[in-house]
C-alpha cells in the first residue's frame, strides 16, 4: 500500500511494473479518468515501462457477473500478466473476479456458491484508487450482481498485490461522489461497530475514530472541495 501525493508520478508504479510480465490489462469505468488526466499519466508510465496494454473499460457501478466474465475472456485471450484496476470499489471488485476467473476452467459463481470451494490461482492484480469509500483495495471480497440469477452477492477473488492512493487523484471527484463515498465509508464502519462481538472494545474504538474522521473531513470538503489535507484523511 503506497499512499502519498505524487506516489504514482514519482516512479513507484514504474518500479513495481518491472516485477510483472509484458502484458497489462488496464481496467477502468467510464471516461472520468480520461477527462481528469489520470488515464494519460498512467498510460505514459505503462508505455515508458515497455508494457503492452490491453484496455478493458465501461465497468459499471455495481458490476455484473457478465462484465466480469467478459473481462476474464479478454484476459485469457491476451495472456495478461497483470491487471491494473483504476477507479473505485466497483472497478476493484470486478477485477478481483476477473483475476480469478481467468485462471479457472469452471464457473467461479458455481464453484464458490455450489461447491463451496475457492480459487487458488490468480492473475496478479494492482489497484490505483481514484474514488474513496469502500476500501476494496485492501481485501479479496467482491460484490457482484448476477443478472440472470437476479442475485447480488459476494465472491472471493484476488487480493491486490499493491495499491496506490494518491489523494490528488480524487481532487476532481464531484461533490455528489464525495458525499456518496463518505456515507459508504460510514456504513462500513458501522457494520463493525454495531456487529458482534459487543465486547470487542478495540474494534469499536477504531470504528469510532474512522467515523469521526469522515464526518470532520467531509464537512471541510463541503465548503472547500479541493482541500488536499481533507482528501488525504
Model-found features: residue ranges?
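Short glycine-rich or small-residue beta-strand-to-loop segments that form or flank ligand, phosphate
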Residues: 24-29, 54-57, 83-86
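Active-site cofactor/substrate anionic-group-binding motifs, chiefly glycine-
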Residues: 42-57, 74, 78
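Short beta->alpha junction loops
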Residues: 55-65
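Glycine/threonine-rich beta-strand-loop-alpha-helix active-site module
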Residues: 66-168
Amino acid at each position: 500500500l503506497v499512499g502519498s501525493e505524487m506516489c504514482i508520478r514519482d516512479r513507484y508504479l514504474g518500479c513495481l511494473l518491472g516485477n510483472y510480465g509484458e502484458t497489462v490489462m488496464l481496467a477502468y469505468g467510464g471516461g472520468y479518468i480520461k477527462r481528469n488526466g489520470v488515464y494519460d499519466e498512467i498510460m505514459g508510465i505503462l508505455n515508458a515501462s515497455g508494457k503492452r496494454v490491453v484496455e478493458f473499460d465501461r465497468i459499471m457501478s455495481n458490476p455484473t457477473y457478465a462484465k466480469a466474465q467478459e473481462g476474464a475472456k479478454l484476459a485469457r485471450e491476451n495472456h495478461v500478466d497483470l491487471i491494473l484496476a483504476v477507479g473505485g470499489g466497483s472497478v476493484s471488485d470486478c477485477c478481483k473476479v476477473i483475476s480469478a476467473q481467468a485462471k479457472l476452467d469452471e464457473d467461479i459463481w458455481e464453484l464458490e456458491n455450489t461447491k463451496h470451494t475457492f480459487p487458488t490461482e490468480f492473475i496478479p492484480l494492482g489497484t490505483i484508487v481514484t474514488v474513496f469509500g469502500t476500501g476494496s483495495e485492501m481485501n479479496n471480497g467482491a460484490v457482484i450482481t448476477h443478472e440472470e440469477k437476479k442475485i447480488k452477492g459476494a465472491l472471493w477473488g484476488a487480493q491486490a498485490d499493491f495499491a496506490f492512493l494518491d489523494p490528488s487523484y480524487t481532487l476532481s471527484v464531484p461533490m455528489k461522489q464525495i458525499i456518496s463515498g463518505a456515507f459508504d465509508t460510514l456504513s462500513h464502519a458501522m457494520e463493525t461497530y454495531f456487529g458482534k462481538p459487543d465486547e470487542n472494545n478495540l474494534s469499536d474504538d477504531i470504528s469510532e475514530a474512522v467515523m469521526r474522521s469522515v464526518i470532520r473531513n467531509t464537512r471541510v470538503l463541503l465548503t472547500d472541495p479541493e482541500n488536499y489535507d481533507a482528501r488525504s484523511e
